[in-house]
Amino acid sequence: MTTNLSNRHRDTLERIFSHPSSGNIEWRQVRSLLEALGAVTEDHAGNLTVTLGGETEVLRRPHGKDVDQQMIVDLRRMLARAGFAAAGR
């Protein structure tokens, strides 16, 4: 399901699913990936409502530029449920 993604988006997806997880995945990269994969809306506080594969999740914008480990776990779960995975998985 990742064939229509740009190289940049595929790289971000790979880093989300990598073990051990990367500590330097930027929020803007995650947001761009999610916008390429599904429907994304942003509220006035900067939180994203993401709909992928019929499921909707709300992601809170991190305080820094990088996403934390818990958000990476949440992203893996959300993406896996929607049928997305890193290449070779």
Can you say where each PLM-predicted feature lies in the sequence?
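Basic nucleic-acid-binding interfaces
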Residues: 1-89
